[in-house]
Amino acid sequence: MKTYAPALYTAALLTACSPAADSNHPSGQNAPANTESDGKNITLLNASYDVARDFYKEYNPLFIKTYQSEHPGTSVSIQQSHGGSSKQALSVANGLQADVVTMNQSSDIDLLEKKGLVEKGWQQALPDHAAPYTSTMVFLVRKNNPKQIRDWNDLAKDGVNIVIANPKTSGNGRYAFLGAYGYGLKTTNGNEQEAQKLVASILKNTPVFENGGRAATTTFTQRNIGDVLITFENEANYVSKKLTQGQFEIVYPSYTISAESPVAVVNSVVAKKGTQKTARAYLEYLWSEPAQELAASLYLHPRNPEVLARHKADFPDLDSFSPEEKFGGWDNIMKTYFADGGIFDRLTAQK
């Protein structure tokens, strides 16, 4: 199998390539049926989280160009399905024929592993626990920050309206919830009751939870609802520097949560379609230098240290924590905080 790790990848990029299909199919809608590979015409479906669409829109043609240069006569197209991370995982579990999944928390892929759709030990199949890049949670506020929001505790003040994705269905929303909770624990010396009091106040200031991260962005930026959007750093930069200019500002909290974006091949699908090698190559290429450069240019923290060093100015130094170190593994996190009747539900009921 061809290896695309940065140290081993040497193939030159060619100018001729087939365009990637960039169809966005939200969770709950039927994506186009993928035909089985005949060795010459290959179609992959990538089921991904909501705000990853901008990265994969540019990544797919990059991969196609490279793969086709190494496999003359082969035509590759990539289809995309985007939505809340957990909704996407459920769609795959319920039959969405995705060759690969690219999520923003490991529990969503663990669900597929438990159902026998993804190989056991999937995090060891690729470098960096199968997460080619990371992000963190920040605040996006309106120009000049009229509510003077500087840190998580400011979100609990009266008169502040917050927009986030739904923590029950979206990794984006879960990281927002856990970021606030982790800040509460740190600033109260681990006092659970006080941390929950802070988070309950923040939830009280959140009138509605959007289905996914991009839906939350749309509500905040286009519908002009809310004073602050809690979202991934890359999404906040996309809005403030690429989508609009001069309308929004990014606020980095004093203590925030880091977020890995793990990926995996859906074995049950690729075995049926005969797309194993291409699907594997598609994920391996995420660690190539061109893909890592692309990630950094879109404000995703690359794993390649040389690429990260070149983009150091784009990533402020942050005091951050991982959800695993603060709250235990994702199995425990999901059961304790986001299962029906869990801490999130109990705190939301206080709204």
Residues of each region from the PLM?
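Sec-dependent signal peptide recognition
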Residues: 2-9
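C-terminal motif of bacterial Sec signal peptides marking the signal peptidase cleavage site
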Residues: 15-16
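A bilobed periplasmic-binding-protein/Venus flytrap-type ligand-binding module shared by bacterial periplasmic
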Residues: 136-145, 260-277, 294-299
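Ligand-binding pocket segment of bilobal, Venus flytrap-like solute-binding proteins
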Residues: 187-254
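Extracellular/periplasmic juxtamembrane helices and adjacent flexible linkers that interface
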Residues: 270-351
